[in-house]
Amino acid sequence: MAQTPEGKVKEKVKKILKRRGVWFFMPRGTTFGTAGVPDFICCHEGRLLAIETKAGGGQPTKLQLNALRSILNHAGCALVVRETNVDAVEQALDFIECNSNTALCWRGFDEEADRQPDTR
């Protein structure tokens, strides 16, 4: 079965997380799940890291951006990863390792660039 472009990004992220020894899981979107939950929920050095993956021109939905924002507001780290910035995962993990005893958080998404256009 051919992998989707977003699936390829997820595979790259998964390889990095496994190589770095990061605990993570990938919530499955179901009818009974919570909409907007990031693709990867990770814990590294006691810090929450949420990763939303996108491919091509895909943009996070408003619910996804709200979830990422909420994680940041609770001292977690959050980022949107695309084919062009998979290295942001490594950078976020490095940041966590260097700042694991501080209240700093990693913001790996641009609210303006990643905003879902309002189509109402």
Where in the sequence are the language-model features?
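Catalytic phosphate/metal-binding cores of nucleic-acid and nucleotide-processing enzymes, i.e., regions
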Residues: 1-120
